[in-house]
């Protein structure tokens, strides 16, 4: 999968300072995300389809495979994408590298 569309959400503050699946310390101010399949370290361009705002995040965590959302981003990424208040947005994901 090099690109996909679906719903993005942002992490709850309860994860701040906890370890991600790859061992990093989670930081809401970073530009990182969780995905079901993209390899750790992948750079993924996330575009909010409602406003066309984009941000590139690094995958450093995993989501459950049966999750209805396709990506879980930090609060910083959600702010830059313009959906921090709504809590979720329909997005396009594009694997950059």
Range-by-range predicted roles:
Residues 1-97:
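Secreted/periplasmic proteins
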């Amino acid at each position: 999968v090099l690109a996909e569309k679906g719903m993005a959400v942002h992490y709850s503050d309860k994860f701040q300072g906890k370890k991600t699946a790859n061992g990093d310390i989670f930081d809401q101010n970073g530009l990182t995300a969780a995905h079901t399949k993209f390899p750790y370290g992948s750079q993924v361009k996330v575009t909010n389809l409602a406003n066309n705002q984009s941000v590139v995040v690094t995958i450093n965590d995993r989501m459950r495979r049966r999750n209805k959302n396709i990506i879980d981003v930090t609060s910083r990424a959600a702010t830059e994408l313009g959906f921090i208040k709504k809590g979720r947005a329909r997005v396009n994901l594009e694997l950059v590298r």
